[in-house]
Curated annotation (Swiss-Prot):
<feature type="region of interest" description="Disordered">
    <location>
        <begin position="56"/>
        <end position="110"/>
    </location>
</feature>
<feature type="modified residue" description="Phosphothreonine">
    <location>
        <position position="149"/>
    </location>
</feature>
<dbReference type="InterPro" id="IPR052461">
    <property type="entry name" value="EVA1_A/B"/>
</dbReference>
<protein>
    <recommendedName>
        <fullName>Protein eva-1 homolog B</fullName>
    </recommendedName>
</protein>
<dbReference type="GO" id="GO:0016020">
    <property type="term" value="C:membrane"/>
</dbReference>
<keyword id="KW-0812">Transmembrane</keyword>
<feature type="transmembrane region" description="Helical">
    <location>
        <begin position="29"/>
        <end position="49"/>
    </location>
</feature>
<keyword id="KW-1133">Transmembrane helix</keyword>
<feature type="modified residue" description="Phosphothreonine">
    <location>
        <position position="86"/>
    </location>
</feature>
<keyword id="KW-0472">Membrane</keyword>
<dbReference type="Pfam" id="PF14851">
    <property type="entry name" value="FAM176"/>
</dbReference>
<feature type="compositionally biased region" description="Acidic residues">
    <location>
        <begin position="74"/>
        <end position="85"/>
    </location>
</feature>
<dbReference type="InterPro" id="IPR039500">
    <property type="entry name" value="EVA1_dom"/>
</dbReference>
<feature type="modified residue" description="Phosphothreonine">
    <location>
        <position position="157"/>
    </location>
</feature>
<comment type="similarity">
    <text>Belongs to the EVA1 family.</text>
</comment>
<keyword id="KW-0597">Phosphoprotein</keyword>
Amino acid sequence: MDAPRRDMELLSNSLAAYAHIRANPESFGLYFVLGVCFGLLLTLCLLVISISCAPRSRPRTPAPRRDPRSSTLEPEDEDDEEDEDTMTRLGPDDTLQGQELSTEPDGPLSVNVFTSAEELERAQRLEERERILREIWRTGQPDLLGSGTLGPGATATLGRMHYY
């Protein structure tokens, strides 16, 4: 007889809580938001503590590996560079092999990103292409899709420039 009484007690308490929430939705909303904020604050504190207390390990610097393809490079023709696509695609073998981090306590974090002169040259070409594209967009080249006949005396705005 004790089990049905507990079930009825749970049901009546649940109904009483539901009736209280329906009668006071503002207090329920306030408690809910306070709970969410407290949880986020607690998570942030634990994250900061775990980051600050994490042991600092020295990164191992692997022995520099020579790429067997680098010794058999053919000289590139300058005309071929112009025909290339604006994006340089890297294959699975062209990934960066080693990143060396210096962990000086007061100094800045320096990263050696490029492991060969070929990768450095490739990155410089890509950066130059991106700079040229940004400059083209900045100067506001006219949009050719909107250049139809507008009739006499009409004005049109193409891209960022105003044409009369």
